[in-house]
Amino acid sequence: MEHLFDYVGHFGRFQAYLYFASAFQTISCGIHYLASVFIAVTPKFICRAPGNISTVLLPNASTLRLEDAWESWTSKDYLVVQQENGDIWELNQCSRLKREDASYLTYFYDGNKTLFSCSNGYHYDKSNLESSIVTEWDLVCDREWLAKLIQPIFMLGVLIGAVIFGDIADRVGRRPIIWITSTGQFLFGIAVAFTFDYYSFVIVRFLLAMVSSGYYVVVFVYLTEYVGIKARTWASMHVHAFFAVGVMIVSLVGFLVRTWWIYQIILSLTTLPFVLCCWMLPETPFWLYSQGKYKEVEKLIRTIEKWNKISTPCKLSELCPAQETHVDQPNTLKNHNVLDLFYNWSFARRTITVWLIWFTGSLGYYVFALNSVNLGGNEYLNLFLTGAVEIPSYIVACLGMDKIGRRNTLAPFLIISAVICGVIMLIPQDHSTVTIAMSMAGKFSIAVAFGLIYLYTAELYPTIVRSLAVGSGSMMCRIGSVVAPFCVYLTDVWIFMPQMLVGIMAFLTGILTLTLPETLGIPLTSTMEEAAEMGTTSGITKRKALTESNGVVMEKLDQTTDNAAS
């Protein structure tokens, strides 16, 4: 089927329409993946007094309104409040004390006090945020752990959705799954805003994660099956750029809308335009051909010819001769499992390194993104910048891997990101502008590495286990995204703990990456023996001579990008 693009064009008008229409929907994936940054915000809070407050005392000030005290109050202090009935309370974040003697009002008091729990709820600072799920369901103090599980549970849904929908799409086609998942994104996205308690919120968000991940996986395959080999690298890489646009939209909507359920509805409406037109998308020619639906392939070719203004009709039999079907090939691909990735010590070392790259890339990506709101300065601008720096990073990744090689681009940027993490740890905490700038540089570096690992993994393994290699690497990627929120929560232990963990992982992984063979200009391997020889002078020379004698420049990456998103 690859010859089809030599005839109709590798990225003609028809492909451009499908590409931008389908890639547009990946914006919503970026939105939902990071929406919790502002949905689950914990503002300043303090235990609620049982009645109406008439006076508020701070260590060095007094006011009549609690709203006026938030700016001066810090969590290490308690508030002294006098109620309209004369009772005096000392309010902490997770407890409150009632003074026995209410005859005089002072901040400091050495008399008897009675300890009470926060059974009346909490006061929240609403100066910058009207509501979040934390304020809605009091996810603080002994319920704080529930708030911290929101993003990991979502990422677990991402992992499961990628596995389930990727497999179903191979069985029933890409188009039905695109319909189901994009519609699911809209419906579940809206439903999240109307959940009635924490548990219903988490369940619906989990389902939203599954369909969002399913769409992202399948649309990646869908688009690469419509783009010819000459444009496939750039086209597949820049699907990620649409995801980055979604991250920027999250920051913009979060800045404008401070009520969590309205914020969620507005973000979910970005899905609606695609839902209304996704039924018009055709099935891919690769999947139709693999299912023996040749008449539908012929019909699709006629449509592409019309859109791309191809004047000379061509038959499917001319593009795909019978001898290219390789009827016996599938039987050779069924007997392999993940243990084959540990074929020998050399392969085991290669696989462990590749898995570490996937894990570290995902870990660093989400740590930089999720932690951006903790850097100081304007948290909305910080998140916007983390999305904005991704777009040029993919351009650099494309240029680098085509000019200096995959390994020679990947390893330096991993090491650079590690160095940047170290530099961030040395910056004084009052220099927030410098910290933000270095964090953006770190996000840029890790995004370069994360962007090209899909293709590099496929090139490192032979045809018989290539799907397994990319699929298992993708699984490590999802695990990294589940772990990332917990790393960010370690700022409670030490503010630079996330950067330290990412820095250590990136440095070790970058060094190990240097032990991998370079694949730029090297034909794809078909057997374990050929792949094992990759990187040796004799192996490269022998295989280059073989491909040149057959008049082949490089084996097409037909199934590489299909499995890259699995």
UniProtKB/Swiss-Prot annotation:
GO MF annotations, alphabetized: organic cation transmembrane transporter activity
Domain of life: Eukaryota
UniProt entry keywords in alphabetical sequence: Glycoprotein, Ion transport, Membrane, Transmembrane, Transmembrane helix, Transport
Coiled-coil annotated spans: none
A single GO BP: monoatomic ion transport
Role noted for this protein: High affinity carnitine transporter.
Name this protein carries in UniProt: Solute carrier family 22 member 16
Taxonomic source organism: Xenopus laevis
Lineage: Eukaryota, Metazoa, Chordata, Craniata, Vertebrata
Gene name for this UniProt entry: slc22a16
